[in-house]
Amino acid sequence: MLMPKKVKHRKQMKGRMSGTPQRGVSLAFGDYGLQATECGWLDSRQIEAARIAMNRYIKRGGKIWIRIFPDKPLTAKPAETRMGKGKGSPDSWVCVIKPGRILYEMEGVTEEVAREAFRLAAHKLPIPTKFTSRKDANEG
């Protein structure tokens, strides 16, 4: 699973997901991309599940870039524990996603293959996404 090697603070506040991202909204590496249309949290397991779904479909056909990284710790208290007694221990890692953020990029495959691979990956994610390409970015 994706997670930071070392962090300054073990626990973080929840925070808010308002606004649009400052960077990561345009294709940087590949020809096709999967772009988020709403905000949300992506768990490291969800990021990995989507990556595996894409890799299984394209086999050895192209290259995939993961443009997001889970750097926010989520805490959880043990089961059947009474309320209070402090914040729980770090349980998993999430990535804060804002609308417009590019999640994955791909190159070396046809557009039809990329569309289908991203469709399979989108089923593994809890946020709505859309397909983007360099061709669309140049026209718009």
Swiss-Prot record:
Pfam family of the protein (one): Ribosomal_L16
Disordered: annotated span: 1-20
One GO CC annotation: cytosolic large ribosomal subunit
Compositionally biased intervals (Basic residues): 1-14
Domain of life: Bacteria
Endpoints of the signal sequence: none
Keyword terms, alphabetized: Ribonucleoprotein, Ribosomal protein, RNA-binding, rRNA-binding, tRNA-binding
Subunit: Part of the 50S ribosomal subunit.
Protein name from the UniProt record: Large ribosomal subunit protein uL16
Organism from which the protein derives: Geotalea daltonii (strain DSM 22248 / JCM 15807 / FRC-32)
Taxonomy of the source species: Bacteria, Pseudomonadati, Thermodesulfobacteriota, Desulfuromonadia, Geobacterales
Name of the encoding gene: rplP
